Amino acid sequence: MVFFIFLISNIGGCLTPIGDPPLLMGFMRGIPFFWSLHLLPVLLFNAVILLTIFYFLDRRTYRRDIADGLKPDISKPGTEVHILGLHNLIFLVMIVAAVILSGTLPGMEAFRDAEGAVRGIRLFGEVTLTYPALIEIVMILVAAFLSFKTTNVEIRRKNHFTWGAIHEVAVLFIGIFITMQPALMILKANGASLGLSKPFEMFWTTGCLSSFLDNTPTYLVFLTTAGALGFTEGMTTILGTVPIAMLEAISCGAVFMGANTYIGNAPNFMVKSISDENGIRMPSFFGYLLWSVTFLIPVFLLDTLVFFL
């Protein structure tokens, strides 16, 4: 499950904005939807190394189990696999469409006022719920409601579905988002004066902070910082022009190093909670950190040498 978190919950989501929230933030600020396909070489490089490591670890564990007499029982017929609830694919498409619309609608004239700002509902002070964001929220909630109401309860029971993991992650990350705001505000105010001008510097700074401050707002802070450095060549966003190599470094730092801790990315803790509920032993917070330092950090050092120097 640790390597599942490494590869599926984090690194594997780098190819589109719907794969990981940091890239969605970039999409909403003018980065083309399919630009992140540029990260495919980095993804393949990391995936091959980590899958190779996993293969040898798994083979060693398998041989040890066989030596201890823990052989698989092949005398019983295998479990027949059925796919039920296929109509939920419709609701999944609704959610994907909502995410894509959240990045495309703000660029349309109908959603902008005379000053060029995105129209919305002012909540308090300078906080505004934009109409594209409202449409996204409504579409996702409608899809979730329809899925919940139209899916047979027996399917959820057989899948051992509970609200426990969702509740645990929601409470934890509400606390993280509240307590991280001062640190993010300091970074936003002083980011341009940090002296970060090289891709590898952005990769490691974005990544290290993403490990503990959640990768989505951290990505946005450093994308804003890069856009304010005054570059004239690269990707043009609403935050400024960012060199392609630096944009790749920020994107990979946020997405990949969100895997360094359970709190670097919400799905990490979700996987841990679901695993715990189903009796699968997972490392503690610092135990997981030891896994990531042992296996991920050396890979990220190789990333630096190959892609970001």
What are these regions (language model features)?
Residues S9, L44-F56, N88-G103, M139-T150, ...:
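Hydrophobic core segments of alpha-helical transmembrane domains in multi-pass membrane transport
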